[in-house]
Design a protein with these regions (language model features):
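Outer-membrane beta-barrel pore domains
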Residues: 4-251
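Internal, glycine-rich beta/alpha segment that forms the wall or movable "lid"
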Residues: 1
Length: 251
């Protein structure tokens, strides 16, 4: 019977490139626009709680990333801009806050004690001795919600990526997210099974189903000024289904 709460946080000042977000199937579903750069602090918090009782386990986690960004007429280094960004467009600095959370449950059908530190099978996998290790069923729900201001222009209106390059004159026409690739949110349902061969080796097999809100443009249509809002020509990305297998060895 274990109940524990942990909290980790980190903060750093940066003016480099910005990360993209990908699914477990390695598909990018959110990235910043080519003219957007990190300009200030990035703060991450990730509190976590877990509970174990006999073969049953439950873990939940929340994460928030707060990122200061601006727009540069030189573009982003990661998107082919100059190595040092000097032409920051006035009035485009914004703090974006992205949130994610998950809850996962597990049950050891072979009767072992569940633990945050790992599972020790009653009988290690050994065909000669008739041992089959430990078997665990798992289920998880997770979602991420991107800051709605990511999809707005500097003046607060939903905008387009009009124009070949960003300048002080046309800065208001650029959103902070790459509107051709970025979804407003993603939700994933996962079901799987873990096979613990022994205390140090595990084989995991998971099926994941992910849905998206936004993130795809209707074929043949330009980006609308009311992008990612009701009535726009931006549709949801296709659902993603993934079957993932992993072999893990711990020492």
């Amino acid at each position: 019977k274990n109940l524990n709460f942990t909290d980790t946080s980190a903060a750093d000042g940066t003016r480099n490139g910005l990360p993209s977000y990908v699914t477990n199937g390695q598909q990018t579903f959110f990235r910043y626009g080519s003219a957007v750069i990190a300009d200030g602090k990035r703060v991450r918090i990730a509190p976590q709680a877990y509970y174990y009782n006999g073969p049953f386990g439950l873990i939940t986690e929340y994460a928030r990333v707060s990122q200061d960004v601006s727009k540069s007429a030189d573009g982003s280094p990661a998107a082919g801009g100059t190595a040092v960004n000097e032409s920051i467009v006035a009035g485009t600095n914004k703090k974006l806050k992205h949130d994610a959370w998950q809850i996962a449950a597990s049950y050891l059908i072979t009767g072992e004690e569940a633990s945050f530190k790992g599972v020790k099978p009653k009988n290690d996998f050994d065909l000669d001795k008739g041992g089959w290790g430990a078997w665990e069923l798992v289920a998880r729900y997770s979602e991420i919600n991107l800051d709605k201001d990511s999809f707005k222009r500097a003046n607060g209106q939903y905008g387009t990526d009009a124009g070949a390059s960003l300048t002080a004159a046309n800065a208001g026409t650029f959103a902070y997210a790459d509107l051709t690739k970025s979804a407003k949110s993603a939700k994933t349902w996962t079901a799987g099974v873990n096979w613990y061969l022994n205390a140090n080796a595990k084989i995991a097999l998971n099926y994941e189903y992910t849905t998206f809100d936004g993130g795809a443009i209707t074929k043949g249509s330009p980006i609308a000024t009311n992008v990612n809002t009701t009535g726009s020509n931006v549709r949801d990305r296709d659902d993603e289904q993934a079957l993932l297998a992993r072999f893990q060895v711990a020492f």
